[in-house]
Amino acid sequence: MVLMIVSGRSGSGKSVALRALEDMGFYCVDNLPVELLPELARTLATRDTSAAVSIDVRNMPESPEVLETAMDHLPESFTPQLLFLDADRNTLIRRYSDTRRLHPLSSKNLSLENAIDQENELLEPLRSRADLIIDTSEMSVHELAEMLRARLLGKRERELTMVFESFGFKHGIPIDADYVFDVRFLPNPHWDPKLRPMTGLDKPVAAFLDRHTEVHNFIYQTRSYLEQWLPALENNNRSYLTVAIGCTGGKHRSVYVAEQLADYFRSRGKNVQSRHRTLEKRK
């Protein structure tokens, strides 16, 4: 497991880095006192979870030895790594001007320029010990997150999870849906007394729907649409894509179509989850 310490000058992108690490599965803590690092690591060791902790000028120990002592007392299962983010002086000034936030050292009656320079001196002990230094001067938020994934995971793209969920329109449209597809126009197994008690997960219902060309056409065209735009969605710095399929009651058609789409993208090596809202309510 890894204990990633994220530091750097204010405005260099520490919050962005912490969010990116959280998306990679790290347990993230913002501005934890250095002295508590061993305690956090011992707690997480039982969960087999890597952690990321941000340290800035506000919680920097007075002596570098305090950090070294904390590192020495980490559980053996953790490997410490220090990530330091930086940006040139003019970029930091511009970012503060854009956000209109106060610099952490501004309370010392320093000008923004002097606060940035003093912070640089205070953080030098951390910078000199960094395993990885990233200059974010020319980076966007998305580019920084992408670089971290490339450096730490060895790949550029985020593992986007596709969620296919069925629902019934009479129960309302899911508020978490990125895309909503209406399949109420497809042939309805509900009108067959033998199929009515079943769901789209049952083979007789699947066989009924599989006999209809319009069902095949809809599934094919929907998956083609998603495949066309999936690369752009994956590059949009997101973790989930939720596709909601709705029929009247959320029991037959939407369940079948959602499962068909989930199986298709799963067979293409994508991270896929499926859920069925109406069926979950019946349990």
Swiss-Prot record:
Pfam name, any one: RapZ-like_N
Binding site for ATP: G8, R9, S10, G11, S12, G13, K14, S15
Keywords: ATP-binding, GTP-binding, Nucleotide-binding, RNA-binding
Residues holding GTP: D56, V57, R58, N59
Chain intervals for the UniProt region annotation (RNA-binding): 266-283
GO MF assignments: ATP binding; GTP binding; RNA binding
InterPro entries attached to this UniProt entry: P-loop_NTPase, RapZ-like, RapZ-like_N, RapZ_C
Annotated NCBIfam families: PRK05416.1
Function: Modulates the synthesis of GlmS, by affecting the processing and stability of the regulatory small RNA GlmZ. When glucosamine-6-phosphate (GlcN6P) concentrations are high in the cell, RapZ binds GlmZ and targets it to cleavage by RNase E. Consequently, GlmZ is inactivated and unable to activate GlmS synthesis. Under low GlcN6P concentrations, RapZ is sequestered and inactivated by an other regulatory small RNA, GlmY, preventing GlmZ degradation and leading to synthesis of GlmS.
Cross-referenced PANTHER family: RNASE ADAPTER PROTEIN RAPZ (PTHR30448:SF0)
Family the UniProt entry places it in: Belongs to the RapZ-like family. RapZ subfamily.
Record note on quaternary structure: Homotrimer.
The name this protein goes by in its record: RNase adapter protein RapZ
Gene source species: Edwardsiella ictaluri (strain 93-146)
Taxonomic lineage of the native organism: Bacteria, Pseudomonadati, Pseudomonadota, Gammaproteobacteria, Enterobacterales
